[in-house]
Amino acid sequence: MNLQIYEKDKFVEMDSMHDSIATNISIKDKTLLITYDNLNEGVIGRDGQPYYKSKKLTIEYVIDSYCDVKFFRRNKYKYVDLLEENNKFYKLINGCSFMSYKYAIDSFGEIILFFNILEKNKYWCFEISMDAEKIIYHWE
């Protein structure tokens, strides 16, 4: 297993994981875990070969003060505080997989992750906003 650790001042150096399917999103204590599986089959580089050499990646976001999710569908949205209401989050994403399509860092250094929901769900997409103090990539 290969580790990459990014402190808050190095977040812009991270790989953004565009167009990768997240097979699991969970939160434990003050840590958000996102797992990407079959990376060596999904994203193809310019040379026609898989972009990622590793098969699996788990990203561990160590949360400093907050982590929330906004689910979107046409004219409505739903807000969930992941640190307080993670059961509500699990109920909304039950049985789904997600396509990661955007990653942003705002002017305060906070992380914003955008995902499309791939299965039939009452919401189309969601964004996770958080104040992370450290991010750890676990490549397998």
Q: Model segments located where?
A:
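Surface-exposed, interaction-prone regions used to assemble/regulate multi-protein complexes
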Residues: 1-140
